[in-house]
């Protein structure tokens, strides 16, 4: 699937209300492990492909400044509507920026987001971005994310399962892929691994893994 087809796929998901991937409260893996990033209150956290995730609300409640990027305008509008917030909205190149309080979300294709638009980030939280993308786009996404933020501490949630069992998304992402795409910039620590109760979509045994990415020191 190319980038355009992938964008159409997710836009249509939101238009049809097929949002079973949305969680109505903060993910417990986030609340258990965010401290592993060792970020102070006021730190700037990037949440790529954020949807209308309640994780952003929770992070803001912990004192962080949260920036998301989401393809679907529907998701972004619903996010702020559900919080009874009226965001400031402005066009920034091919994207639209919605902001209210310490949360802002860029609506549009993440590959159109630039470091200048994003600004400096102190950390990344990726629960549903990497695993939402087919393999070719995952590689492009990983490279783009590094170009946006540079190597900063990251909390990443992945799924690991037999990809032949399910078509995806969500897609299986194993440690070998992480090392191939991120190994030049990060050291990895597996913080937690747990079996998906009942199997993924009730069909396939799977493990959900939480990784901490720690930036490697610059080579001399």
Swiss-Prot record:
GO terms for molecular function: thiopurine S-methyltransferase activity. The keyword Methyltransferase applies. One of its GO terms (biological process) is methylation. The lineage of its organism: Bacteria, Pseudomonadati, Pseudomonadota, Alphaproteobacteria, Acetobacterales. InterPro entries: SAM-dependent_MTases_sf, Thiopur_S-MeTfrase_Se/Te_detox, Thiopurine_S-MeTrfase, TPMT. Belongs to the class I-like SAM-binding methyltransferase superfamily. TPMT family. It is an enzyme of class 2 (transferase). This is Thiopurine S-methyltransferase. Pfam families: TPMT (PF05724). It comes from Gluconobacter oxydans (strain 621H). S-adenosyl-L-methionine binds at residues 14, 49, 70, 127. SUPFAM superfamilies: S-adenosyl-L-methionine-dependent methyltransferases. Gene3D superfamilies: Vaccinia Virus protein VP39 (3.40.50.150). Its EC number is 2.1.1.67. Keywords: Cytoplasm, Methyltransferase, S-adenosyl-L-methionine, Transferase. The keyword Methyltransferase applies. It catalyses: S-adenosyl-L-methionine + a thiopurine = S-adenosyl-L-homocysteine + a thiopurine S-methylether. GO terms for cellular component: cytoplasm. Transmembrane segments: none annotated. It is found in: Cytoplasm.
